[in-house]
Structures are given as C-alpha cells and as structure tokens.
Amino acid sequence: YPESIDWRDKGAVTPVKNQNPCGSCWAFSTVATVEGINKIRTGKLISLSEQELLDCDRRSHGCKGGYQTGSIQYVADNGGVHTEKEYPYEKKQGKCRAKEKKGTKVQITGYKRVPANDEISLIQGIGNQPVSVLHESKGRAFQLYKGGIFNGPCGYKNDHAVTAIGYGKAQLLDKNSWGPNWGEKGYIKIKRASGKSEGTCGVYKSSYFPIKGYR
C-alpha cells in the first residue's frame, strides 16, 4: 500500500456535503464510499443520494441514526442508489420514493468489514478506496476542530460516521458531513498513533467499504 494517499487528488471525492440538522451521518458516509468506488471502477464521479437511504433503508432510523452495514446492504440489495440530482437531500426523513425516480443508479455488489482495532488493515483498505469509519464526535474539541492533526480529547464511544479518504504517515484524512465551514474545509486529520488499539476517538473500531466489480 502507498505511503500516503488522498483520493481527492484522484477525483474520487465529491464536494463536502451538510447533513444538518438531521442525524444522517451514516447515509453520508455510506454514499461517499459508493461515490468513491464508482469513480475508481468506472472513471465517473457522480454525486449520489443520501435522501434515498434516509427514506428507504429500513434497517436504519432516519434522522435518529443508522448503520453503515444496513445502508451499504440497502444499496447492494436494491440495484444501487439514485443520483443526488434525481433524489436531492431534504434534511428530514420522508416516504421512500425510490420506485418513482428515473435515471441510472450506481450499483455495488456488497461490502466488507475491516478487521476491528487494526490500524494497518484500515490503511490498506483506504489505499484501495474510501472507507466508512466511526468516531466519537460529541466532545467539544471535536466539534470545534479547526485544523491540524487531531488527537482529542475524545473517548471511544463511537457516535458519528465519516469517510476516510486518505492518510499520511501521521494521520488519517476524514471527510465529514458538517459542511465546508467546519474543520479544514469540511475535513479532519485524525492522529494515527494513539497508543490505543481502538485508535484516536475510536476510529479503528468499526470500518466498512463497498465492493464493486469491474464492468
């Protein structure tokens, strides 16, 4: 795996989006990973619909929170996810309108879990494609992050999904869904060496990525 990578440089990351005021980070994280692998496999970067997951993923709980696995599985089971343009974000859960929407969907075949609490496995995963990761984000330090390599203070009770889109020797590079005015233009650098197997803010505990074949 490469010493460092930033999937933005390879055109595999859409502009930073904003979930607020809805607790739909899970949908944004999943969608960003699907946008990433789709660009890597097809050469096309297409902004996809978080709203479809919010409305239609029955395993998750809308604006009250959801699951990386359930939402990635929804995309695999339902022939893909519609584009952002076709099914735009509304900041609240509505009824599922996926069947009424037209246009092509972006498909995946399934997902894989990165072994928990294993830094190198996660780095290898991110070397191949953007990966959905969880953080503890409720602390003031995380909320007010402005830049640099973040190493807390934070605990390990994961409550927020983001998308790891790169890394360097000292840090992971994560895309958040709190708009471009938060952090470093919407991104956060998380310290890699935390001295704990869970990683800084629990970032190594629960990571998933979608699988998409070449067609």
From Swiss-Prot:
SMART domains listed in its UniProt record: Pept_C1
Parts of the chain that traverse the membrane: none
GO BP annotation list: proteolysis
Disulfide cysteine pairs (residue numbers): C22-C63, C56-C96, C154-C201
CDD domains cross-referenced by the UniProt entry: Peptidase_C1A
Domain of life: Eukaryota
InterPro entries: Papain-like_cys_pep_sf, Pept_cys_AS, Pept_his_AS, Peptidase_C1A, Peptidase_C1A_C, Peptidase_C1A_papain-like
Pfam families: Peptidase_C1
Location of the active site: C25, H160, N176
EC number: 3.4.22.-
Keyword field: Disulfide bond, Hydrolase, Protease, Signal, Thiol protease
A GO molecular-function descriptor: cysteine-type peptidase activity
PANTHER family cross-referenced by the UniProt entry: CYSTEINE PROTEASE FAMILY C1-RELATED
Function, as annotated: Cysteine protease.
Family under the similarity heading: Belongs to the peptidase C1 family.
Protein name: Chymomexicain
Species of origin: Jacaratia mexicana
